[in-house]
């Protein structure tokens, strides 16, 4: 889990737009966040396997 202070800091509107960054809405992780879902790769994978994301399927080839 991310530090609560950093999660709260990321939720504030930055003084300059370029200073803003995305964090996972579920766990607060700052890296590898998919903007479309607002989730990091780990949470996205867990939720997709559990069937909690509509329209997302595990691919196999």
Curated annotation (Swiss-Prot):
Its cofactor is Zn(2+). Gene3D superfamilies: 30s Ribosomal Protein S14, Chain N (4.10.830.10). Coiled coil: none annotated. Part of the 30S ribosomal subunit. Contacts proteins S3 and S10. NCBIfam families: PRK08061.1. Belongs to the universal ribosomal protein uS14 family. Zinc-binding uS14 subfamily. This is Small ribosomal subunit protein uS14. It comes from Mycobacterium sp. (strain KMS). The lineage of its organism: Bacteria, Bacillati, Actinomycetota, Actinomycetes, Mycobacteriales. The gene is rpsZ.
